[in-house]
Swiss-Prot record:
Protein name per Swiss-Prot or TrEMBL: Cytochrome P450 71A9
GO molecular function annotation: heme binding; iron ion binding; monooxygenase activity; oxidoreductase activity, acting on paired donors, with incorporation or reduction of molecular oxygen
Induction comment: By fungal elicitor.
Phylogenetic lineage: Eukaryota, Viridiplantae, Streptophyta, Embryophyta, Tracheophyta
Pfam families hit by this protein: p450 (PF00067)
Positions annotated to bind heme: C440
Length: 499
């Protein structure tokens, strides 16, 4: 794959002839823009993004302020890095900030039809309404309680039968993948372990492409430069594999007209979408490609977010033995005489819920959220922001804001025992799942998986690092991607707990 340095050189070379066309008019130059770092000709501030952009942008924002203006290639970009600025924008200008930029990999892999990346407009409104009312309603999420319980039980059995340390990263990804497969497709997998592994591999490659660097996202007039990025062929390959998979899933569901699946309580996600597709009263006609786009939303968000969060939680608890002990004592004191923690127990596990919140603060799944785009000119704190500006909300930086958090770099779950701050988009100090119209509608889908799995892992086992490793050896480095995973897999020794 061509290196980023070579790409920058090629960009400089090929854009020389387009300088005049890319220059902004004089009137726009006179705009009072937010402060930002000096930019290079042609590439702007692209060279300052680094391999983990949320970290680089946090560093730059510490120097230039919580509202920062960058030029990423030919794309004007606003970076929001404090709770105060997030509150100003999303309380007073949410509709203006609800657009989405056109991103190459997301458009291709999502059939231009995902709810997450759809432009702000009628299609997005109608599909989001369908998702909230039909797929993510409290009643629908509750209907899958048995699926979550059964899959967590299988996870516990796998761990109990293991000899030696277990790769918790792989096990939790398999857990969330199986849960989403059953909820979305009606089956744990379509034909066995090999097929489940295939789905898992497709999702990993999809995540890699969504987090990949495609030149056209920063130089829209130079789309042909994508061929030099080294990702184009990989993107097309995974798209074909996914498309064939989703085609087969839809065909199987259309062919399956058994009475067992006719009741709403037996419907999976594909059943619901096919039913809605046939409804003549729908405001928009839904195509098969749009059904596939919704499935991409559910698979990508439903598997990666939950599994990454569970691993960050277990990693932080290993690093903080007192917190681990308190969490285990809480769940073991509450749940007695039962083999497993059930979802009805979760509301009483206040400390464990605080642990989850603290980890979402320190390790938001998508630290820059999904990029937004301003739909019209607007003024923020006296700064004039032009339409079509891309917006990056640095949720990680906001959650580390010392104006809002005491000792923000420390792992302190206790802070949430006395604080009403939550992660559902109502508090601007913490936005791991976004805020406003474009906030993630699937948070209530993912969190029962995280909490049920975590509570049972702590209830059933004592955990420690493999022999010979100390807390100081636990690698907490982040991996590159649209969802931030722990780079090194988490291997732990599990000892069954005996009351």
């Amino acid at each position: 794959m061509i290196s980023f340095t070579v790409f920058v050189f090629l960009t400089l070379l090929f854009t020389l002839s387009l300088v005049k066309q890319l220059r902004k008019p004089t009137a726009e130059k006179r705009r009072l823009l937010p402060p930002g770092p000096r930019k290079l000709p042609f590439i702007g501030n692209l060279h300052q993004l680094g391999t983990l952009p949320h970290q680089s942008l946090q560093y730059l924002s510490n120097k230039h302020g919580p509202l920062m203006f960058l030029q990423l290639g030919s794309i004007p970009t606003l970076v929001v890095s404090s709770a105060e600025m997030a509150r100003e924008i999303f309380k007073n200008h949410d509709s203006v900030f609800s657009g989405r930029p056109s991103l190459y990999a997301a458009n291709r892999l999502g059939y231009g039809s995902t709810v997450s990346f759809a432009p702000y407009g009628e299609y997005w409104r109608e599909m989001r309404k369908i998702m909230i009312l039909e797929l993510l309603s409290p009643k629908r999420v509750q209907s899958f309680e048995a699926v979550r319980f059964e899959e967590v039980k299988l996870l516990l059995q796998t761990i109990a039968l293991s000899h030696g340390p277990v790769n918790l990263s792989e096990l939790t990804l398999s857990l969330t993948n199986n849960i989403v497969c059953r909820i979305a497709l009606g089956k744990r997998n379509r034909s066995g372990a090999d097929d489940a592994n295939k789905v898992s591999e497709m999702l990993k490659e999809t995540q890699a492409m969504l987090g990949g660097f495609f030149p056209v996202d920063f130089f829209p007039r130079l789309g042909w430069l994508n061929k030099f990025s080294g990702l184009e062929n990989r993107l097309e390959k995974i798209f074909r594999e996914m498309d064939n998979f989703y085609d087969q899933v839809i065909k199987e569901h259309i062919a399956d007209n058994s009475s067992e699946r006719s009741g709403a309580e037996h419907e999976d996600v594909v059943d619901v979408l096919l039913r809605v597709q046939k409804d003549p009263n729908q405001a928009i006609a839904i195509t098969d490609d749009q059904i596939k786009g919704v499935l991409v939303d559910i698979f990508v968000a439903g598997t990666d977010t939950a599994s990454a969060t569970i691993i960050w939680i277990m990693s932080e608890l290993i690093r903080n033995p007192k917190a681990m002990k308190r969490a285990q004592e809480e769940v073991r004191d509450l749940v007695t005489g039962k083999e497993m923690v059930e979802e009805i127990d979760l509301s009483k596990l206040l400390y464990i819920k605080s642990v989850v919140k603290e980890v979402l603060r320190l390790h938001p799944p998508a630290p820059l959220l999904v990029p937004r785009e301003i739909t019209e000119n607007c003024t923020i704190k006296g700064f004039e922001i032009p339409a079509k500006t891309r917006v990056l909300v640095n949720a990680k930086s906001i959650a580390m804001d010392p104006c809002c958090w005491e000792n923000p770099n420390e792992f302190l779950p206790e802070r949430f025992l006395v604080s009403p701050i939550d992660f559902k988009g109502q508090h601007f100090e913490m936005l791991p799942f976004g805020v406003g119209r474009r906030g993630c509608p699937g948070v209530n889908f993912a969190m029962p998986v995280v909490e049920l799995a975590l509570a049972n892992l702590l209830f059933r086992f004592d955990w420690e690092l493999p022999l010979g490793l100390g807390i100081q050896d636990l690698d907490m480095e982040e991996a590159i991607g649209i969802t931030i995973h722990k780079k090194a897999h988490l291997w732990l020794k599990a000892t069954p707990f005996c009351e």
